[in-house]
From Swiss-Prot:
Keywords: Cobalamin, Cobalt, Cytoplasm, FAD, Flavoprotein, FMN, NADP, Oxidoreductase, Phosphoprotein, Transferase. Cobalamin (vitamin B12) cytosolic chaperone that catalyzes the reductive decyanation of cyanocob(III)alamin (cyanocobalamin, CNCbl) to yield cob(II)alamin and cyanide, using FAD or FMN as cofactors and NADPH as cosubstrate. Cyanocobalamin constitutes the inactive form of vitamin B12 introduced from the diet, and is converted into the active cofactors methylcobalamin (MeCbl) involved in methionine biosynthesis, and 5'-deoxyadenosylcobalamin (AdoCbl) involved in the TCA cycle. The lineage of its organism: Eukaryota, Metazoa, Chordata, Craniata, Vertebrata. This is Cyanocobalamin reductase / alkylcobalamin dealkylase. Its EC number is 2.5.1.151, 1.16.1.6. Can utilize both FAD and FMN. The keyword Flavoprotein applies. The gene is Mmachc. It comes from the Eukaryota. It comes from Mus musculus. Monomer in the absence of bound substrate. Homodimer; dimerization is triggered by binding to FMN or adenosylcobalamin. Interacts with LMBRD1 and ABCD4; the interaction ensures the transport of cobalamin from the lysosome to the cytoplasm. Forms a multiprotein complex with MMADHC, MTR and MTRR; the interaction with MTR could modulate MMACHC-dependent processing of cobalamin. Heterodimer with MMADHC; the interaction might play a role in the regulation of the balance between AdoCbl and MeCbl synthesis. Its main location: cytoplasm. Belongs to the MMACHC family. Residues 239-279 are annotated as: Disordered. GO terms for cellular component: cytosol; mitochondrion. CDD domains: MMACHC-like.
Length: 279
């Protein structure tokens, strides 16, 4: 890894990892090459970026302390606001580094996602993005089958939280890092994709590999609860109709994506994720 990348990665990790996050560097070009022009990140190909994901430890190390410290007068989505707080803390801690942050849930005015998180996780080498195209002679016919990322240490017990872009820092010599193919067999991939698409409520697809750590029962209850009911579950008041703070504004300062080429498989409805079953 280039010394400059290693230095920046260490700085970001020192800020985020104690709270249950992981960080992976990648080049914007690796992401853009897999997607149609409408989804490209509008930066030169060698631009450095970091993928950020949360591990099972984030719930206790970040979310609970965040709720106790009352960083927001109004809570709308505690997990998203907690993640936003920690990502912003990186940009505030290193003001000399220009960073632009895109959270996994951010969309353009036309509702197009600002980042395809699973594609970013794959190119960063963080988690393998298993899709229908990875199953030879698949058995699903005309059924819609969405893809899912599997982490080599946590299986499906993690969540992709966003991307940190560093405009002006280019790393053309950064070596690509392939994600570990931890579900290498056809049968295993069929079981994984069917579990994710048809039985995600039972959590079993997340054990596609034996994980080092799973979500606690407390986390599972929280993420199984419909979002509109999660504040009540935590004993928190429902939000008012009015925005509370500027901290709840979108994270990204991105401009309109530039044009370029690529394969539809990473975006087509047949492989795009369904409504999320939870982090």
């Amino acid at each position: 890894m280039e010394p400059r990348v290693a230095e920046l990665k260490q700085k970001i990790e020192d800020t985020l990892c104690p709270f249950g996050f992981e960080v992976y560097p990648f080049q914007v070009a690796w992401y853009n090459e897999l997607l149609p022009p409408a989804f490209h990140l509008p930066f030169p190909g060698p631009t450095l970026a970091f993928l950020v994901l949360s591990t099972p430890a984030m719930f206790d190390r970040a979310l609970k302390p965040f709720l106790k410290s009352c960083h927001f007068q109004t809570l709308r989505d505690p997990v998203d606001q907690c993640v936003s707080y920690h990502l912003r803390s990186v940009t505030e801690k290193f003001p000399e580094v220009h960073m632009e942050v895109i959270a996994d849930y951010e969309v353009h005015p036309n509702r197009r996602p600002k980042i395809l998180a699973q594609t970013a996780a794959h190119v960063a080498g963080a988690a393998y993005y298993y899709q229908r195209q990875d199953v030879d002679a698949d058995p699903w016919g005309t059924q819609h089958i969405a893809g899912v990322c599997i982490h080599p240490r946590f299986g499906g017990w993690f969540a992709i939280r966003g991307v940190m872009l560093l405009p002006g820092i280019e790393v053309p010599n950064l070596p690509p890092r392939k994600p570990p193919d931890c579900v290498p067999t056809r049968a295993g991939r069929i079981t994984l994709l069917e579990g994710f698409n048809f039985h995600w409520r039972d959590w079993t697809y997340r054990d596609a590999v034996t994980p080092e750590e799973r979500y606690s029962e407390e986390q599972k209850i929280y993420f199984s609860t419909p979002p509109a009911q999660r504040l009540a579950l935590l004993g928190l008041a429902q939000p008012s109709e009015h925005p509370s703070t500027t901290s709840e504004l979108p994270l990204s300062l991105l401009t309109k994506p530039q044009n370029s080429r690529r394969a539809r498989s990473w975006l087509s409805p047949s492989v795009s994720p369904p409504v999320s079953p939870g982090p």
